[in-house]
Every structure is written in C-alpha cells, then in structure tokens.
From Swiss-Prot:
It comes from Adiantum capillus-veneris. The 4 large subunits of the cytochrome b6-f complex are cytochrome b6, subunit IV (17 kDa polypeptide, PetD), cytochrome f and the Rieske protein, while the 4 small subunits are PetG, PetL, PetM and PetN. The complex functions as a dimer. It is a single-pass membrane protein. One of its GO terms (biological process) is cytochrome complex assembly. Its main location: plastid. The chain crosses the membrane at residues 5-25. It is found in: Plastid, Chloroplast thylakoid membrane. Keywords: Chloroplast, Electron transport, Membrane, Photosynthesis, Plastid, Thylakoid, Transmembrane, Transmembrane helix, Transport. It comes from the Eukaryota. Component of the cytochrome b6-f complex, which mediates electron transfer between photosystem II (PSII) and photosystem I (PSI), cyclic electron flow around PSI, and state transitions. PetG is required for either the stability or assembly of the cytochrome b6-f complex. This is Cytochrome b6-f complex subunit 5. GO terms for cellular component: chloroplast thylakoid membrane; cytochrome b6f complex.
Amino acid sequence: MVEALLSGIVLGLIPITLAGLFVTAYLQYRRGDQLDIR
C-alpha cells in the first residue's frame, strides 16, 4: 500500500517538476532576449 502511494506521488510530481523547469528556462530565455544580451 505504501509503495502504491509513493509511486502515485512520484508519478504526480514528475510532470509538475518538468513543467516548472521548462517554464523557468523559457522565462529566463525571454528575459535574456528582451535585455538583448550578446
């Protein structure tokens, strides 16, 4: 029962973590593009 709960939590957190990393990288890319660095 504990294994099922942990696997459910992990499967739920993985997409959220990937989405958060993607959004953060995208915002940093947009910010750098707006500042026109290099």
